[in-house]
A protein has these predicted regions:
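Short, T/G/N/S-enriched strand-turn elements that build extracellular solenoid repeat scaffolds
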Residues: 8-22
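Solvent-exposed, glycine/polar-rich loop segments of beta-barrel outer-membrane systems
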Residues: 212-217, 253-259, 295-314, 348-369, ...
Length: 474
């Protein structure tokens, strides 16, 4: 039975003939069409909708079809009727929406799902008929009684798993700049006692995880870095400052193909102190501050259609790094440099407020403290051509471990514009592991111009990296 009166369904003619085959009962299923044209959670069907079916029931009763089971076609709506006991006909029919919290089971054991469905329930009927959010709820209304898996999938899609490892993505974006600053300082020769180095770069990466609720992604980044160096009278002794920005786009491997854009800028200072006259043993300390502006376009599947929500947030950070390295010259062109380093970082991530879209979320502001020791070794090669250009190559491997709370931080979200409580987002389990990273770079240096290409791999997240850069020294 269609419940809206628009494009009404017709009763089955001569259904009472089934009694001749021994069938004495039948089901009458009431659809949810009326919910498309109403924001109410309680709907009474009109007499004009019921009457044709009463005629069908009366005619079938005369033929011996005497029992009728009447229920809703929808998992999330319940049909209730009052019947005339004498004639078995329907006097009144009502549709009542089942609260989404019912499908979260025991709220004490499924608190996160319960809190989300509580917010979802509060959003029902808020937006106007014909809006995209209303269309989303229509999709949920159409889920059938035996299609509970579709409802669970829709809940999971809408809960904002794209924000699950937001801390790691913010940190990895900053790491791109750190790596480029390192290239400027260590891989390119200094032209004079006071040098200015500028480099444009582009890079690509991929992150994979086995943690449930954390989504794989690829990223593409490009940007510019600048470094000013003041070298002292003693080889290796100097100070300087650096700055740069990176624009990093993450493309998630979820069903909707969500996308996040990060724009981060850094500015910092450093000081290098040699411990011998040929600068084979050197200690460098650096510190910087960062500012980020980020946008999320979260896309999610509900039944068979993609919906989306858009949010923005800012980041603010400060970091301090100490590195001690020792150079061993193996041949005229080849050197080996083992080193140890530790980086301390504090990052504040502002509240994410999704301003547009469907089932918008608020993600609670948070922060992380990173303590990351690293030990590694670089094998460097340098060859001077007859033209004066220099061919450089570097193969490096290092082990680093995160001792702070980056992925361990509790990220929480809630359905925006509701009084529902916060629910927890998944944590990246792989962050408990250390990371072995391997990098190879190849460059050509002229007196002023130069370029590099690099590739790398991280065991944590099975992260593949590749990039190119062009620089100017003056």
């Amino acid at each position: 039975m269609g419940s809206s009166g628009i494009n009404p369904t017709n009763p089955i003619a001569n259904i009472g003939a089934l009694a001749n085959s021994g069938i004495k009962s039948a089901d009458l299923i009431i659809g949810t069409e009326a919910a498309k044209y109403s924001n109410s959670k309680y709907i009474q069907l009109g007499k004009d909708i019921i009457e044709p079916y009463n005629k069908m029931i009366t005619a079938a009763l005369r033929r011996g079809l005497s029992k009728w089971e009447i229920y809703s076609s929808s998992l999330t709506w319940q049909a209730t009727i009052t019947k005339n006991k004498a004639t078995q006909t329907i006097e009144n029919a009502y549709m009542t929406k089942v609260p989404y919290t019912v499908f979260a089971a025991d709220k004490n054991t499924t608190r996160d799902t319960y809190n989300f469905t509580d917010g979802l329930e509060q959003r029902y009927g808020v937006e106007a008929i014909g809006s995209r959010e209303k269309e989303l709820f229509n999709k949920l209304n159409d889920i059938g009684n035996n299609e509970g898996i579709l409802l669970k999938q829709a809940f999971d899609e809408m809960m904002g798993h794209q924000y699950a490892n937001i801390h790691q993505r913010v940190q990895s974006t900053g790491n791109i700049l750190d790596k480029e600053f390192n290239y400027l300082k260590n891989d390119w020769s200094t032209a004079s006692k006071k040098s200015n180095k500028i480099k444009t770069f582009g890079s690509r990466g991929e992150y994979k995880t086995n943690t449930a609720g954390v989504i794989d992604y690829t990223n593409n980044a490009y940007g510019v870095v600048y470094m000013h160096e003041n070298e002292g009278l003693r080889l290796g002794k100097g100070t300087g400052w650096y700055t740069g920005f990176v624009y990093n786009t993450f493309k998630f491997k979820d069903i909707g193909k969500s996308k996040e854009e990060m724009l981060e800028a850094k500015v910092g200072i450093y000081k290098s102190i040699p411990f011998d006259y040929n600068n084979s043993l050197n200690w460098t300390v650096s510190g910087d501050i960062s500012l980020g502006y980020n946008k999320m376009n979260r896309k999610f599947l509900v039944v068979d259609e993609i919906f989306n929500a858009r949010g923005r947030y800012n980041t603010y950070g400060v970091a301090l790094k100490n590195e001690l390295g020792k150079d061993f010259r193996l041949t005229e062109n080849i050197s080996l440099r083992p080193y140890g380093a530790i980086k301390l970082e504090y990052m504040k991530i502002g509240k994410v407020k999704e301003k547009s879209g469907e089932i918008r979320l608020d993600v609670k502001d948070s922060h992380y403290i990173s303590v990351r020791p690293e030990v590694g070794v670089d094998l460097n090669y340098k060859y001077i051509l007859a033209s004066g250009k220099i061919i450089t190559a570097r193969l490096g491997t290092a082990y680093e471990d995160e001792l702070g709370k980056v992925a361990k931080a509790n990220n929480k979200a809630k359905v925006a514009h509701t009084s529902a409580d916060w629910f927890n987002l998944p944590k990246e389990k792989e962050d408990r592991k250390g990371n072995v990273k391997t990098d190879f770079s190849l460059g050509v240096e002229g007196e002023i111009l130069g370029g590099t290409a690099n590739i790398g791999y991280d065991t944590k997240g099975h992260n593949m990296r590749a990039g190119v850069g062009f620089r100017v020294i003056f």
